[in-house]
Curated annotation (Swiss-Prot):
InterPro entries, alphabetized: Integrase-like_N, TACO1_YebC-like_2nd/3rd_dom, TACO1_YebC_N, Transcrip_reg_TACO1-like, Transcrip_reg_TACO1-like_dom3, YebC-like
Family, similarity comment: Belongs to the TACO1 family.
UniProt-annotated location(s): Cytoplasm
GO biological process, one term: regulation of DNA-templated transcription
Organism: Anaplasma phagocytophilum (strain HZ)
GO molecular function terms noted in the UniProt entry: DNA binding
Protein name per UniProt: Probable transcriptional regulatory protein APH_0480
TM helices/strands, residue ranges: none
Presence of the UniProt keyword DNA-binding in the record: yes
Record-level GO cellular component terms: cytoplasm
PANTHER family named in the record: PTHR12532:SF11, TRANSLATIONAL ACTIVATOR OF CYTOCHROME C OXIDASE 1
Keywords linked to the UniProt accession: Cytoplasm, DNA-binding, Transcription, Transcription regulation
Keyword DNA-binding among UniProt keywords: yes
Length: 245
C-alpha cells in the first residue's frame, strides 16, 4: 500500500505539473497571436512578435506550436480574437496589484478577477485607481548565460541610456532586468537584441515607486495564495505589484 501511495502521489504531482505547463503554453500562444496581429507575421519585421517568440522559446514552447500560433493570427477565428486589458486593484494586505490580461470576453474576465480579489480580501478597482503608485517603464530581461556577467550588460545598458539594471534570481539562474524610459524602449530593446540576441522578456512594465513587505509569514502566505489564483486564471498573462516577497 505504501508503494501504491507513493506512486499515486508522484502521478498526482506530475498531473499538476502537466496542467500548469499546459496553461503556460496557452498563455504564450495567446501572446504570439496578439503580437502577430499587431504588425507583420514576420518576426524580423515585427519587434512585438519577435519578443513574444523569444519568451515562448525561453519556456520551451515547441517550434511547431509557435508556427501554428502565427498562422492562427492570420485567420479570423472568434476564439482567437483577444483584447489586451489591464486591471488594477488591492490584494490582501492592501498591496497594489496590476493584472495584465488577454481576453476574448471582457465581461467574463472582469467577473472572474473580481471574484478572486474578493475571495482573498482584496478589491478590484477602477482603471487609474493605483497607477500613481507606479512608474511606467520599458523592461528587457536577459538570463545571465545570455550576457555573461552583470558588468557586461551594465556597461552596454548604461551606454544606451537605460535608467537602471536589476539583478534577480528566478530559482534557476540569475536574470538581469534592464529598465528604461518608455520613449527609449524600442531603441534600447533593438540595440540589446543586436548585441546579445533576443531577451527572455521585452515589454512595457509598471514599476512600483516603493515596495512593501508583508507584515508576517501568514500575510506572505495569503499573498502567495492570491497570486497563484490569479496566475491560474486562463486570461491572466502576468501580474505586477508593489509587494516584495
Amino acid at each position: 500500500m505504501a508503494g501504491h501511495s507513493q506512486f499515486a502521489n508522484i502521478k498526482h504531482r506530475k498531473g499538476a505539473q502537466d496542467a500548469k505547463r499546459a496553461k503556460l503554453f496557452t498563455k504564450l500562444r495567446k501572446e504570439i497571436i496578439v503580437a502577430a496581429r499587431s504588425g507583420s507575421p514576420v518576426p524580423e519585421l515585427n519587434p512585438n512578435l519577435r519578443s513574444a517568440i523569444a519568451s515562448a522559446k525561453a519556456f520551451n514552447l515547441p517550434k511547431d506550436r509557435i508556427e501554428a500560433a502565427i498562422r492562427s493570427a492570420q485567420g479570423n477565428e472568434a476564439d482567437d480574437s483577444y483584447e489586451e486589458i489591464t486591471y488594477e486593484g488591492y490584494g490582501p494586505g492592501s498591496v497594489a496589484i496590476v493584472v495584465h490580461a488577454l481576453s476574448n470576453n471582457r465581461n467574463r474576465t472582469a467577473g472572474e478577477l473580481r471574484h478572486i480579489f474578493t475571495r482573498h480580501g482584496g478589491k478590484l478597482g477602477e482603471r487609474g485607481s493605483i497607477s500613481y503608485l507606479f512608474d511606467h517603464v520599458g523592461l528587457i530581461v536577459y538570463g545571465a548565460a545570455q550576457v555573461g556577467s552583470f558588468d557586461v550588460i551594465f556597461d552596454e545598458a548604461t551606454s544606451l541610456g537605460a535608467i537602471d539594471l536589476e539583478e534577480h534570481d528566478n530559482g534557476e539562474e540569475k536574470e538581469y532586468h534592464v529598465i528604461c524610459q518608455v520613449e527609449d524602449f524600442g531603441r534600447i530593446r533593438d540595440a540589446l537584441y543586436e548585441k546579445f540576441s533576443d531577451g527572455v522578456t521585452a515589454r512595457l512594465s509598471w514599476r512600483p515607486k516603493q515596495k512593501v513587505k508583508p507584515a508576517s509569514d501568514e500575510a506572505s502566505a495569503k499573498l502567495i495564495s492570491f497570486l497563484n489564483d490569479l496566475d491560474d486564471n486562463d486570461d491572466v498573462q502576468y501580474v505586477e505589484g508593489d509587494f516584495e516577497l
